[in-house]
């Protein structure tokens, strides 16, 4: 069995048995895919995290692509390993980060992954703790309820993929003749994002995903980011707190 869900934001309450009774029939060979913003290594501590211990104790394996609200400094500390045909970071034995531009064969189906998204809650800017006027800016923005984040504390430029990651994604899809069963991302391709919320502006990543949407053949595209549960044009599945069966 394979299930998918949307943003966790470090709150995996939905995986408790009263909310997800289907897990009674699952094993570690079954998967729950989180479509970004999992936040499971937010504090960067590789050991002694009771939440990771609780997730490891679940009967299924958790897979996640990264979103924009991730600690990319912490994720990069994990060694890159090969798993089911693609590159991963193993956070725990059964909590696994599926990296960008990869393809994984899971239960006889091919899954292409491309995490990341541009933050939309930074209208008032990104603060740098090394700046001489950081505390003045911080206090002012807090008093005025500003929308801001702090570099390497609550925001990372790695939220958007590098040119190298996009090139690797194209190479992966070239190898597969641009045909996969499922595409897992955090944000949506530009055309689909406009149908979700026309107020969101295209960016480097949504335009790249639009290229993938136009060139590839796939059954379903699952994504998160927009905090809603909807199906768009029959094959694009936007997930937030819902958990849906994929296989």
Regions found by a protein language model. Give the residues of each.
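Generic domain-boundary/flexible-linker signal
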Residues: 43, 73, 122, 193-194, ...
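Active-site-proximal loop/helix segment associated with metal-binding centers of metalloenzymes
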Residues: 93, 107-199
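Beta-strand-turn-beta hairpins that frame and shape the catalytic cleft
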Residues: 1-3, 103-113, 182, 233-237
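Internal alpha/beta domain cores that form substrate/cofactor-binding pockets in large enzymes
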Residues: 158-247
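Catalytic metal-binding/acid-base residues of hydrolase active sites
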Residues: 8-9, 38-39, 68-71, 117-118, ...
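Structural motif
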Residues: 2-4, 32-35, 182-186, 222
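Acidic, histidine-bearing metal-coordination/catalytic regions of metal-dependent phosphoesterases
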Residues: 1-13, 132-134, 144
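Core catalytic region of metal-dependent phosphoesterases/phosphodiesterases
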Residues: 5, 10-106, 198, 202-209, ...
């Amino acid at each position: 069995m394979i299930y998918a869900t949307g943003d966790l934001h470090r709150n995996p309450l939905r995986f408790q048995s009263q909310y997800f009774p289907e897990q009674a029939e699952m094993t570690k060979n079954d998967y729950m895919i989180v479509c970004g913003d999992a936040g499971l290594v937010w504090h960067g501590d590789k050991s002694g995290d009771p939440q990771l211990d609780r997730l490891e104790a679940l009967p299924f394996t958790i897979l996640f692509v990264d979103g924009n609200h991730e600690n990319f400094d912490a994720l990069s500390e994990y060694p890159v390993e090969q798993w089911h045909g693609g590159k991963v970071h193993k956070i725990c034995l059964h909590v696994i980060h599926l990296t960008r531009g990869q393809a994984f064969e899971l239960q006889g189906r091919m899954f292409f992954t491309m995490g990341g998204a541009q933050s939309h809650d930074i209208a008032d800017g990104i603060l740098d703790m090394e700046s001489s006027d950081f505390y003045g800016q911080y206090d002012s923005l807090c008093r005025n309820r500003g929308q801001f984040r702090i570099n390497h504390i609550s925001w990372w430029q790695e939220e958007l993929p590098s040119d190298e990651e996009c090139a690797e994604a194209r190479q992966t899809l070239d190898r597969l003749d641009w045909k996969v069963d499922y595409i897992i991302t955090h944000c949506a391709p530009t055309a689909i994002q406009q149908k979700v919320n026309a107020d969101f502006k295209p960016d480097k990543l949504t335009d790249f995903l639009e290229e993938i949407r136009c060139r590839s053949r796939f059954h379903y595209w699952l994504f998160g980011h927009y905090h809603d549960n909807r199906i768009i044009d029959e094959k694009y599945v936007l997930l937030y707190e819902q958990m849906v069966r994929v296989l």
